[in-house]
Each structure stands twice: as C-alpha cells, then as structure tokens.
Regions:
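Membrane-interfacial loop- and helix-cap regions that link adjacent transmembrane helices
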Residues: 82-87, 91, 142, 148-168, ...
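Membrane-water interface regions at transmembrane-helix termini and the short interhelical loops
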Residues: 110-116, 228-250, 324, 436-447
C-alpha cells in the first residue's frame, strides 16, 4: 500500500559466478559496462532487481533488450542462481500500479470536499489521473527507446551522471518525507484505536483523548522509541520478498476499512439529515458543487491539488513493471493498457472513499479512520477492528518506503556497496530521525502538500525531460514543447501549494 515501489534486495555479488560477457551493445553506457567488471571476493555488493511491492518478481531475462547476457546473481542466502523472469500480465500489472498508488492517505481526501464541493473534487481526481497516465506513457516511451528498465539508468543515459544524481536526491528527499508521514500516521491510529476501544465513555472524541492523555510526552516518547526499534529492525532485511505478506495485509486492511465505510455511510447520512440538516439554515447544507471556497486566502485549491498528485504518484515504479512486458509482442501497448486500467481502478477507489467520507459527515468531513466521530458516540466494534488492522499493517508496510531510500543512497554515495555496518547504522539513524520529526510535527495534510510538491519532479518533470531527449527531435518540436509546458504548469501549481503550506507552518 504504498505511493513508492519496493526494490527487491538480496544477496552478495560473487565474481566466480560471472560468465564471460559478449561485446557491449552500442547503446550501453560506460557506467553500465563498468558494472560487469569483476570485483574482489571480499567486496559486499547488492544486486538490485526491482519488483514493486513484492506481489510478483520481475527478474533479468536470459538475454536483455540490449542483446547482452546478464551475469548470474545470488539469492538472499548467497547461493548462485540466474533470476527467473515472470512475464507481466495486464491484470497483474494493473494490480501492481493500483497498489503503488494506494495508501492509508486514501481516507483523508474527503476532507477537501468541504472546500472543493463533492462533484468538483471528483472531477479533479479524474484530471490528475489523466495527467499521470500522460506522464506514464512518456516513461514507457523513454524506457523502450533506451532499452533500460531502471529510472536512474535511463536518467543517466539521457542526462548524464549529474542528471542521475539530481534524480536520486529527489528520490531520497521524497522517500524520507513519505517515510516520516507514514510513521506519523501510526501514532494517531493506535491512539484512536485505544480511545474508541477502552476510553470511549471517558473521552468524547480523539482530540479530547489526545489533549488529556495520548499526546503527553511520557506516552509519546516511549511509543516512538519502541516504534522506531521495531520498524528499524524490520528495515534491516535485505530481501524484500521476505515481506511479501505485508502487501496482502495492507491491501486486506485497506479493503476491509473501505467496505466498512461503504456499508456505514448510509446510516451516517441518515443521521445527518435527521439531526443536523435544517432547510432554512445554509450552514447545515452539504457542499455539492460550490467550488468558490477552494480559492480563499488559504489556497486550499493548490493544497488539494498537491494532495491528489501524491495520491497518484507511481512513475518510478512503472519501469520494473514495464520490464515484464518487453519480451512480449506489443509489450508497450499492453503496458499502456494496464497503466490506463491502473489509473481507472485507483480513481474508482478514491471516488468510493471521497463519496463515503462526504456522506458520513457532509458538514465537516474528516479522516475516515482516525478523526471520524462515531455516530451517537456509540461503540463501533467493526471500526475499532479496522483501526487496529490498518495500524498494524502500516508497521509492516512502512519498510517498503525505506527500501527505495536505501537504494538511492547506496547508488548515489557508496557505488552500490552495502555493508552490514552501514546497513545497521544508516537504517536506525534514518528511522529514528523520521520518528523524531513525526513526533514533533503531526500535520498529516501538510505532509501531503509537501510530498506532493516533491513528487511532481519525479512523476512529471524528469519523465517529460527524458521523453523529450529520447525522441531525438528538437526541444522546440511542437509535441516536446507542449509536453514541457504542461509539466511546468503542474510543477507551478504544486509549488504554490508548497509555499502556502510552508507559510501556514511559519505563521502558525
């Protein structure tokens, strides 16, 4: 359940297993050819074979798109083997793309319906989905033209080493921000579970419970320390396939919560009509189509747009999925079909979440899991279970946001070498740093605005620039120019959201 792909990590490189390589293809860059050189036997190095979210593996072909025979790699136990490729199906790739896009933040977007109006918020979901599909097709084009399946390698192929470093910096910042956001979500999820399960009569809602008890430092400090130790220990794992089960737990918990909200929203809306709605009082009327409130001094429109950009961000996960189609007839066409279906399914799930969240509380729609007020302060056992399931699933799925962070760091600064000492130190320092930030700064919607701004560079600017480079045509060619202008407009909208959110944080 994640807005980032999970790289498959595992094993060490054994030069004795490497067979002689044929001459390099003319499209192979010097950097790539150097990766096939033998290394000393005592060098510990990771061979990364990306497989987003671990739902199915994508391995190296017996012969890749450049006509080269890849060297054998080792598994997590150090045993030599040649990675097996599993060809992607349209259905499997669609599920992968949908799973990359979705996360527990899906339950927060109904909050924006109050300002956007329900209908207009749904319209903007469609617009953002179309923008992302447009960007994804550019990713597929640049991957096909370069013959490479790795985002960083494609960037270096067309933009040089400086371009690759710039991309990895954005990926590192994005991964840290996303990791911090989801670590921060675990705390209120557990707090809401405890309040609704054990303190429902003593504290009227979660805000009251947090002010009086859960938010106290004597609870918050040991909670985040323990959480960092647990997540950090899980993140030490090098082979992400050992966490395959977490994807199913996360999807199952999210699906259970969505189905529950769908079932309950009718009774909540009926409760609103009977107890809150007054025909002669506009303040009690639901905002169905009034878009004007989105353009206030708070710049809610731009913040909401950035939130949606983050919700659909999946471009860096497209490349390894695309690799499974390359050996198939009409592979690019199949990839574009699965991408379109992935955007469609993601949009449908967002529609369900937004509509149900809006109907649950049309006046002040809240987060559906944490801040939703239980009807008549009743004990909602199914929702109590949902909160616990989502909180526990996050503990096991958060490491999925850490793996691409570690991958970007070692590719940028350690030349792919990952020693045990570096793994332990970097992992615990990173997780504890994110936990400290999450404990101090807990504004989830603001996190989404910041991450949305960072994501546009990874999801729009880099893919469009790479596509322009790969066409071999001048920058001023009308299609290239149109793509670039559209990407800049998206980045500008996200920049306004970033500045507005930063201003809110500074001014209080």
């Amino acid at each position: 359940m994640t807005n980032m792909p999970n790289p498959q990590e595992g094993g060490s490189y054994n030069p004795s297993n490497v067979s002689p390589q044929p001459a390099q293809h003319k499209n192979v860059s010097p950097t790539e050819s150097n990766q096939n050189e033998q290394r000393p036997a005592n060098t510990e190095i990771q061979i990364f074979n990306q497989g987003p979210n671990g739902l199915f593996k994508t391995g190296q072909n017996d012969q890749n798109s450049n006509g080269q025979n890849p060297p054998p790699i080792t598994n997590a136990n150090g045993e030599g083997r040649r990675a097996e490729i599993k060809k992607s199906s349209i259905f499997g790739a669609t599920l992968m793309i949908t799973n990359i896009c979705l996360g527990t933040t899906i339950f927060t977007f109904a909050v924006r319906a109050k300002s956007f109006g329900l209908v207009w918020l749904l319209v903007f979901c469609v617009i953002v989905a179309l923008l992302n599909y447009w960007s994804i097709t550019r990713c597929i084009n640049s991957s096909s033209r370069s013959g490479k399946d790795d985002f960083s390698e494609i960037t270096e192929y067309y933009m040089g080493r400086k371009g690759r470093i710039a991309l990895n910096i954005f990926l590192i910042v994005y991964s840290y921000a996303t990791l911090t956001c989801f670590v921060g979500l675990i705390y209120p999820l557990f707090g809401r579970f405890i309040q609704s399960a054990f303190y429902r009569t003593k504290y009227r809602d979660y805000d009251h419970f947090e002010d009086e008890k859960w938010g106290k430092m004597y609870i918050k400090v040991p909670f985040f320390v323990g959480l960092a130790l647990i997540i950090g220990t899980i993140c030490l794992i090098r082979d992400i396939n050992k966490l395959n089960f977490s994807a199913y737990i996360g999807v199952g918990a999210c699906a259970y919560a969505i189905i529950l909200v769908m079932v309950q929203c009718h009774s909540y809306y009926k409760h609103y009509k009977n107890t809150v709605y007054k025909e002669d009082d506009d303040s009690t009327h639901a905002n169905w189509v009034n878009f004007g409130d989105a353009f206030t001094s708070d710049l809610v429109f731009f913040k909401g747009f950035a939130n949606l950009l983050f919700a659909y961000a999946c471009q860096s996960g497209i490349f390894p999925i695309h690799a499974g189609f390359k050996m198939q007839k009409d592979g690019d066409k199949k990839m574009k079909i699965s991408s379109a279906l992935g955007m469609l399914f993601t949009t449908l799930l967002h529609f369900i979440s937004i509509i149900c969240g809006f109907l649950t509380d049309p006046i002040t729609p809240e987060d559906l899991i944490i801040y939703r007020k239980d009807k008549d302060n009743g004990k909602d056992i199914p929702m109590v279970i949902a909160r616990l399931l989502v909180a526990v699933s996050l503990i096991f799925t958060v490491p999925g946001y850490y793996f691409p962070l570690r991958l970007s760091v070692i590719n940028s600064f350690t030349k792919g070498i990952l020693t045990t000492k570096f793994n332990i130190i970097f992992t615990y320092v990173s997780v504890f740093a994110c936990s400290v930030i999450a404990a101090i700064y807990d504004k989830i919607l603001n996190y989404l605005s910041y991450i949305g701004f960072i994501s546009v560079f990874i999801s729009f600017l880099f893919p469009i620039l790479l596509n322009i480079k790969s066409t071999g045509k001048k920058f001023t060619y009308w299609k290239n120019l149109l793509d670039f202008i559209l990407a800049i407009v998206v980045c500008a909208l996200a920049l306004v959201a970033f500045v507005a959110t930063l201003k809110d944080d500074i001014t209080g």
